[in-house]
């Protein structure tokens, strides 16, 4: 038998075995967080969407990020990234944990804007006047808030 034909038959048989195995053993849902949007209908417009615990101290980078956040982000995302009902989501939320939205996601969001995909607030426009370094410091501030609030 030709070696190429033998190799082809082997690959087909192996592929079939993998497909059969996957059909018999479907992937189990992970025990991650819910991606369902919470019901905020009982909250007043502009009300914070999260109760944010503030850490005892921030790193120097997070302190600079906090100042930049307050100038460029808090108008929509609220004080301490708690979000605002009807305006923008809280960034101190499981949805934005590092395993789901890495720090680069914040850089890209600020640079390019974001099409609404987790929440019903509409699209986020690009943020003018921030460098990548500024956004990385903002991300550091958000990560330290998230850590203080048990997000990761």
Question: Which sequence ranges carry the predicted segments?
Answer:
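Positively charged n-region of N-terminal signal peptides that target proteins for export
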Residues: 1-4
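Hydrophobic membrane-insertion alpha-helices, especially the h-region
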Residues: 7-19
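Hydrophobic single-pass membrane-insertion segments
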Residues: 19-31
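Electrostatic cytochrome c docking/interface patches
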Residues: 33-68
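Stable alpha-helical elements in mature extracytoplasmic
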Residues: 61, 102, 106, 134-135
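The canonical Cys-X-X-Cys-His
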Residues: 65, 69-79, 124, 138-142
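Gly/Gly-Pro-rich "capping" loops immediately C-terminal to redox-active cysteine motifs
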Residues: 66, 79-111, 126-129
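Axial heme c-ligation environment in periplasmic c-type cytochrome domains
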Residues: 85-92, 112-145, 150-152
């Amino acid at each position: 038998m030709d070696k190429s034909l033998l190799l082809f038959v082997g690959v087909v048989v192996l592929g079939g075995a993998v497909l059969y195995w996957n059909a018999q053993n479907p992937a189990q849902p992970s025990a991650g967080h819910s991606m369902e949007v919470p019901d905020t209908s009982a909250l007043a417009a502009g009300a914070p969407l999260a109760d944010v615990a503030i850490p005892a101290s921030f790193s120097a980078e997070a302190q600079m990020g906090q100042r930049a956040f307050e100038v460029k982000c808090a108008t929509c995302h609220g004080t301490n990234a708690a979000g605002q009902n009807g305006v923008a989501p809280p960034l101190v939320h499981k949805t934005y944990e590092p395993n789901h939205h890495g720090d680069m996601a914040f850089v890209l969001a600020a640079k390019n804007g974001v099409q609404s995909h987790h929440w019903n607030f509409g699209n986020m426009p690009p943020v003018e006047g921030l460098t990548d370094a500024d956004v990385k410091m903002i991300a550091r501030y958000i990560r330290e808030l998230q850590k203080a609030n048990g997000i990761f």
